[in-house]
């Protein structure tokens, strides 16, 4: 197989691990390497990745750096939030939702450069290997996939560092680099490893990089207004912005008020339990607001059906099935439900809390004060409720007459 692979597209961050993979691919597969670096809002300068790739012998024309922030938010994050997707009741899927976009870009570059394979730096223990590879195989099943962590014998930090030194790969650590295994994008930051491998141990205070500690948040609450169009956020406090700008603004507001920290143990697709800590400030606000606007614009049974289907939808994303018939079927249903999810939601942010204090929809609200008022009304005949209750109780009445006990 190795001799058949002449060109490989590598998901490349410019960091130590993927730089070692780059050199390993050149040596082990004797392949030409194409690098792809995605800007999905991780907050790092990406041009150093270009310089690093050049220093490792990658041709200038084989270095791809793409700004995918708006595509990430518009086509992936917003699509997911239309479903109110949460995995196992808590996780907002910040890492999971980024992987299909990266897989798609890898395949597009492989097709453009006539590459034989793609490669990634995900380990053989985690979910990301599944997400990258399911996505790639769905989009181009003819591409080979190289996962070095499943092949090489560089199975310790010491061996990796020795390999880097042997091949002249810069191993100087950035002064601000976290010792934790981190993943960052415009939706979240995740932390794994070190003290977090003990589920009973409290995370170190200096681990968190984004959301303020509650003791450091303002002592005054802040009221904001979010506007939705067909289920997607379109404005904050009346200001229209691009999808990436909207999420960035929500992140700023949420982080300021201590919103979005999470410490959970989740069930990985590969079978093991894993502890992760997450910061999702903007997503936490967005979820609350989206459910609030749905509460006045969605039909009851449509809303309940969405809630029943959501865990399946969330699991599909978590497990890597973004490019699958079943996810696309669910997405079509979800998107159909959002046609009338238009309006504004007012929220109060304070000390880690997101409180809905108002919601309105000029043309799509199903909330009728005339029907639900506690005052006298002329539209609802309360006598009708007697027949409604009797028909719904009919099975209980029949069972009771037959001596059934509940």
Swiss-Prot record:
Its main location: cytoplasm. One of its GO terms (molecular function) is ATP binding. CDD domains: ASS. InterPro entries: Arginosuc_syn_C (IPR048268), Arginosuc_syn_N (IPR048267), Arginosuc_synth (IPR001518), Arginosuc_synth_CS (IPR018223), Arginosuc_synth_type_1_subfam (IPR023434), AS_cat/multimer_dom_body (IPR024074), Rossmann-like_a/b/a_fold (IPR014729). Disulfide bonds: none annotated. L-aspartate binds at residues 123, 127-128. GO terms for biological process: argininosuccinate metabolic process; L-arginine biosynthetic process; urea cycle. Homotetramer. Belongs to the argininosuccinate synthase family. Type 1 subfamily. This is Argininosuccinate synthase.
């Amino acid at each position: 197989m190795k001799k058949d692979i002449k060109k490989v597209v590598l998901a490349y961050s410019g960091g130590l691990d993927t730089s070692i993979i780059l050199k390993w691919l050149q040596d082990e597969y004797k392949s030409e390497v194409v690098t792809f670096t995605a800007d999905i809002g991780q907050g790092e300068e990406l041009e150093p990745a270009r310089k690093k790739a050049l220093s490792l012998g990658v041709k200038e024309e084989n270095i791809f750096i793409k700004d995918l922030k708006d595509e990430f938010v518009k086509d992936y994050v917003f699509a997911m939030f239309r479903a109110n997707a949460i995995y196992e009741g808590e996780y907002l899927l910040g890492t999971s939702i980024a992987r299909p976009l990266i897989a798609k870009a890898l395949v597009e570059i492989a097709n453009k450069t006539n590459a034989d394979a793609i490669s990634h730096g995900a380990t053989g223990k985690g979910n990301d290997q599944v997400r990258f590879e399911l996505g790639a195989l769905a989009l181009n099943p003819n591409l080979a996939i190289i996962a070095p962590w499943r092949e090489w014998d560089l199975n310790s930090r010491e061996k990796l560092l020795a390999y880097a030194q042997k091949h002249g790969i810069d191993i100087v650590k950035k002064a601000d680099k976290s010792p934790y295994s981190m993943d960052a994008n415009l939706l979240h930051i995740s932390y794994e490893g070190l003290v977090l491998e003990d589920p009973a141990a409290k995370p170190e205070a200096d681990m968190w990089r984004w959301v303020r500690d509650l003791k450091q948040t303002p002592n005054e609450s802040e009221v904001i207004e979010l506007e939705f169009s067909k289920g997607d956020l379109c404005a904050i406090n009346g200001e229209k912005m691009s999808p990436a700008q909207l999420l960035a603004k929500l992140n700023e507001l949420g982080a300021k008020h201590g919103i979005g920290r999470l410490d959970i143990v989740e069930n990985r697709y590969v079978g093991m339990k894993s502890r992760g800590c997450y910061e999702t400030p903007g997503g936490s606000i967005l979820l609350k607001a989206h459910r609030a606007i749905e509460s006045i614009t969605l039909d009851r049974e449509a809303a309940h059906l969405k809630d029943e289907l959501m865990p399946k939808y969330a699991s599909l994303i978590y497990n890597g099935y973004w490019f699958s018939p079943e996810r696309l079927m669910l997405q079509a249903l979800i998107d159909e439900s959002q046609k009338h999810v238009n309006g504004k939601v007012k929220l109060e942010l304070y000390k880690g809390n997101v409180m809905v204090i108002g919601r309105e929809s000029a043309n799509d609200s199903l909330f009728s004060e005339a029907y639900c008022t506690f005052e006298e009304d002329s539209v609802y005949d309360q006598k009708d409720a007697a027949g409604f209750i009797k028909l719904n109780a009919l099975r209980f009445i029949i069972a009771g007459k037959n001596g059934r006990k509940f």
